[in-house]
Swiss-Prot record:
Name the record gives this protein: Dual-specificity RNA methyltransferase RlmN
Gene Ontology CC: one annotated term: cytoplasm
Extra remark beyond the main annotation: Reaction proceeds by a ping-pong mechanism involving intermediate methylation of a conserved cysteine residue.
Record PROSITE patterns: RADICAL_SAM (PS51918)
Taxonomic lineage of the native organism: Bacteria, Pseudomonadati, Pseudomonadota, Gammaproteobacteria, Enterobacterales
Domain Radical SAM core: 108-349
Cofactor dependence: [4Fe-4S] cluster
A Gene Ontology molecular function term of the record: tRNA (adenine(37)-C2)-methyltransferase activity
Amino-acid positions noted as binding [4Fe-4S] cluster in the UniProt annotation, renumbered to this chain: 122, 126, 129
Annotated localization: Cytoplasm
Similarity comment: Belongs to the radical SAM superfamily. RlmN family.
Length: 363
């Protein structure tokens, strides 16, 4: 294991290399007088060997190591707390600006998924989601997104029998498309063969429907897409997801269709996320309506039993009602699954992430 550098007293004008994707690292290194191939060497040290001490990077020239020390540093925010569920799910908590964000690790037999946060809090105020009730502080930097993966990988290699992360989902705290540039840069690092080296189909970005940003994403990057729909019509969606009053279902799904036409990662269809709320969006007629609005969009529907959080005014649909709802959709030809609750006992399940946020949004 490599000895870590002391990051105290680092000047603000130094660059955290975890904020830079490949192209940006290459430009930075060229400015230091390094050759282009040094980009690969440096990224391997950072992401494959988890080394944040330039002095230990033995295949870099001494003068380049000196310049790197003078102009930059490598710092991944530490996890300050770990909670482990009876089902093996792990919640890691990171302190940023004296606030807390949450990262979830979900191990399964054939895969291991890391759910990362993209913002400190969330501004969308979806009524069924704990994160939305906490308010919003700021976007995470690229390094703060990447730190979650960097630290998780490090822990898994050291403590969990050399386990690896096979999938990364942007389904933690925040709306990824409201932090578009930083999320795209982070995804580039995740995709890079000398970064985390995941394929585009193993990275999932979930959005509640920020239509202009989704339209921009079409030209920027191709990853698996999940849409937080949660209602079959605008009337219901307006009542539980205020963002729908700005970007309604029709405009959202039109944007999704455009993305799918340009995507190789979504050949199997977009994942439609639908939280099950008793008496609100779970009736047979809602299933029929959902099938109708999705009939022209290749999709897989994931029904999510609602997870309780304090002061919420919802009740989860019964198992029987969820099964009936799922079967209606299956008869209409949709690949429909029911999400298994993971990490519910440690507040790590879908919609339960709260962190500790200083809200900067005025009501």
């Amino acid at each position: 294991m490599h000895k870590s550098i002391n990051i105290k007293n680092i000047s603000d004008d130094k660059i955290n290399l975890l904020d830079l994707n490949r192209k940006e690292i290459e430009i930075f290194l060229l400015s230091l007088g390094a050759k282009k191939f040094v980009t690969d060497q440096l990224m391997k040290w950072i992401y494959n060997r988890h080394c944040n001490n330039f002095n230990l990077m033995s295949n870099l020239k001494k003068d380049i190591r000196k310049k790197l020390n003078e102009r930059s540093y490598i710092f991944a925010s530490n996890f300050i707390e770990e909670k482990i569920s009876y089902d093996g799910t792990v919640k890691w908590i990171t302190s940023i600006d004296k606030q807390k964000i949450e990262t979830i690790y979900i191990p399964e037999k054939k895969r291991a998924t890391l759910c990362v946060s993209s913002q400190i809090g969330c501004s969308l105020k979806c009524k069924f989601c704990a994160t939305g009730q906490q308010g919003f502080n700021r976007n995470l930097k690229v390094s703060e997104i990447i730190s979650q993966i960097w630290q998780a990988n490090k822990i898994l290699k050291e403590k969990k029998n050399n386990s690896t992360i096979t999938n990364i989902v942007f389904m933690g705290m925040g709306e990824p498309l409201l932090n578009l540039n930083n999320v795209i840069s982070a995804i580039k690092i995740i995709l890079d063969k000398n970064g985390f080296g995941l394929s585009k189909r193993r990275i999932t970005l979930s959005t509640s429907g920020i239509v202009p940003a989704l339209n921009k994403l079409i030209k920027k990057i191709d990853v698996s897409l999940a849409i937080s729909l949660h209602a079959p019509n605008d009337f219901i969606r307006n009542s539980i997801m205020p963002i729908n009053m700005k970007y309604n279902i029709k405009s959202f799904l039109n944007s999704v269709s455009k993305y799918l036409k340009h995507s190789h990662a979504n050949r199997g269809g977009v994942t439609v996320e639908y939280v099950m709320l008793r008496g609100i969006n779970d009736l047979n007629e809602h299933a029929e309506e959902l099938g109708n609005i999705l009939k022209k969009i290749p999709s897989k529907i994931n029904l999510i039993p609602w997870n309780f959080f304090k002061n919420a005014n919802f009740i989860c649909s019964s198992k029987n009602r969820i099964n009936i709802f799922a079967n209606i959709l299956r008869k209409k030809g949709f690949n429909t699954t029911i999400r298994k609750n993971r990490g519910q006992d440690i507040g790590a399940a879908c919609g339960q992430l709260t962190g500790d946020i200083v809200n900067r949004i005025k009501n």
